[in-house]
Amino acid sequence: MTMTDPIADMLTRLRNANAAYHETVAMPYSKIKAHIAEILQKEGYIQGWRVEDARVGKNLVVTLKYGPTRERAIAGLRRVSKPGLRVYAKKDNLPRVLGGLGVAIISTSSGLMTDKEAKKNGVGGEVLAYVW
């Protein structure tokens, strides 16, 4: 069976592994998931990510990040634009997550970027997810 929303699947796997204090979480690889993982690492929400070749297909393995007293780096993840209801934002209406404390991941014509980068570059796009 095909997956309807692979990005939502990725976010759910991250959310569940984070709640259970797992060190790593594996998921099927795609370029967009790798770009999302890159953004999460750059913003300090995950420790790292790598691509593993399995016999059947590639896997994206994400290493989660926790503080010294096991506090989670990711407090929340939310999928915004879904296959049934797409959400777009113009450059003047880019969302702010928790008043600027969180990050919105936006798919633009210039690639995936955070809300701050999109505002700096003056581009809008599809709002994929919120991370805080």
UniProtKB/Swiss-Prot annotation:
InterPro entries: Ribosomal_uS8, Ribosomal_uS8_CS, Ribosomal_uS8_sf. GO terms for biological process: translation. GO terms for molecular function: rRNA binding; structural constituent of ribosome. Keywords: Ribonucleoprotein, Ribosomal protein, RNA-binding, rRNA-binding. Pfam families: Ribosomal_S8. SUPFAM superfamilies: Ribosomal protein S8. One of its GO terms (cellular component) is ribonucleoprotein complex. Part of the 30S ribosomal subunit. Contacts proteins S5 and S12. Belongs to the universal ribosomal protein uS8 family. One of the primary rRNA binding proteins, it binds directly to 16S rRNA central domain where it helps coordinate assembly of the platform of the 30S subunit. NCBIfam families: PRK00136.1 (NF001109). This is Small ribosomal subunit protein uS8. It comes from Thermobifida fusca (strain YX). The lineage of its organism: Bacteria, Bacillati, Actinomycetota, Actinomycetes, Streptosporangiales.
